[in-house]
Amino acid sequence: MATTKSSYRRIFGGNPRSSSSGNRYATSSTRYTLGSAMRPSTSSRMVYSTSSSPAVFKSSSVRLRSSLPPARMADSVDFALADAVNLEFKANRTNEKAEMIELNDRFANFIDKVRFLEQQNKILVAELEQLKGKGTSRIGDLYEEEMRELRRQLDQATNDKARVEVDRDNLADDLQRLREKLQDEMIQKEEAEGNLQSFRQDVDNASLARIDLERKVESLQEEIAFLKKLHDEEIRELQLQIQESHIQVDMDVSKPDLTAALRDVRQQYENVAAKNLSDAEEWYKSKFADLSEAANRNNDALRQAKQETSDFRRQIQTLTCEIDAMKGSNESYERQMREMEENFAIEAANYQDTIQRLQEEIQNMKEEMARHLREYQDLLNVKMALDIEIATYRKLLEGEESRISLPVHSFSTMSLRETNLDSHPAETHSKRTVLIKTVETRDGQVVNESSQHHDDFE
């Protein structure tokens, strides 16, 4: 930051002269003349120049010249001229005393103003140090803590979002797997319904076959009953015939071969009847066993088909319930995911607003710190100008004291030793003091400060 130019005239109402190279303060020369014998002259010049950092202040301060030209006086002292000189000297001394009082008052005012400005400078420096130290660190700590909290919440929200996305992907995979399983179950259901239809057809066919077999069994039972009845009638007829044959045998004893013949016939009929009865019973039993076995088979098939149908129905109901539950869970997860995305978007917007607000506060603090630094730099420049002005007035006071004491001494010498004034030439003293002050500033702060004094005598 370049050195800021300040004007002493704007603050204290002085009359500094400024040029393109910097600020220049010059004081006018004062010359007092004592007749033709004494011409003391005092001239002082203060030069203050500023440039870019590092700044160099060169002060060519007080150059005092006091000359006593050779006094040319007559052999006798002109007392009238001496009285005039005394009156003029008293008038000049009165004026100089008034000027010194005014300068002392102005110098006291300047000292008060310098003290006040030094106190204000200390207050501003303390505030600046406080802002640089505690304020900046506190705001920085708060900002860092807030940023860490926001980063932690952002990481947590990112992790939650990633976890929700993983859950969503897992649910999508589960839903896809359940859909595939549902398709398989639907295919199996269709196959089961086809099998059930075929089983129903088989059951119907088995029922028809069972009905046919039952009708056949009834017809066979009727036929067996008819045959049994016929057999009983034949047996009765044979018994009647046998009885009749016995009667005839009794009546006709003379026929010896009839009994044997009847016995043979009866034996033959009994054999035929027994054979027919056994054959009929065996055929009936075999047919009944076949029909019973077929009926049992059909009943087993029907029972198995009914059981499979009930199992398939239970599976269909279970899968339907699972599908409904999965649909509800999927809708719930999707709703939760939408809510979490909305909450995450709202929180992200709030975090962005908080970050923007903190950045604006940091920018405002930086601008305020820059303003304090500029004010501090202006006050520092004013302080330097006041230091230079005080040094100038100090040199002027020293020059005035030397100028006031020098004519009195010369006048007493002239009055008492007039012979020596003719024989000794006046001595001319010239003292030149050069003060070189180097102040290096960086970013509005004094980094290095050094001063050098050089005294030259002429």
Swiss-Prot record:
Ranges where the record places region Disordered: 1-27
The ranges of region (Tail) come to 401-458
- Similarity comment text for this entry: Belongs to the intermediate filament family.
Q: What is this protein called?
A: Vimentin-1/2
Q: Which keywords does UniProt give here?
A: Coiled coil, Intermediate filament
Entry keyword Coiled coil: yes
Q: Name one Pfam family in it.
A: Filament
The segments labelled Head in the record are 1-88
Q: Name one GO biological process term.
A: intermediate filament organization
Region entry Coil 1B: which residue ranges? 147-238
Please list where the region (Coil 1A) is annotated. Answer: 89-124
GO cellular component terms, semicolon-separated = axon; cytoplasm; intermediate filament; plasma membrane
Q: Kindly list the cysteine pairs connected by disulfide bridges.
A: none
For this protein, what post-translational modification is recorded in UniProt?
Answer: One of the most prominent phosphoproteins in various cells of mesenchymal origin. Phosphorylation is enhanced during cell division, at which time vimentin filaments are significantly reorganized.
Cross-referenced SMART domains: Filament
Record bears the keyword Transferase: no
- This protein's species is Xenopus laevis
Q: Which residues form the IF rod domain?
A: 96-404
One GO MF term: structural constituent of cytoskeleton
Q: Where is the segment annotated Linker 12?
A: 239-261
Subunit and interaction comment: Homomer.
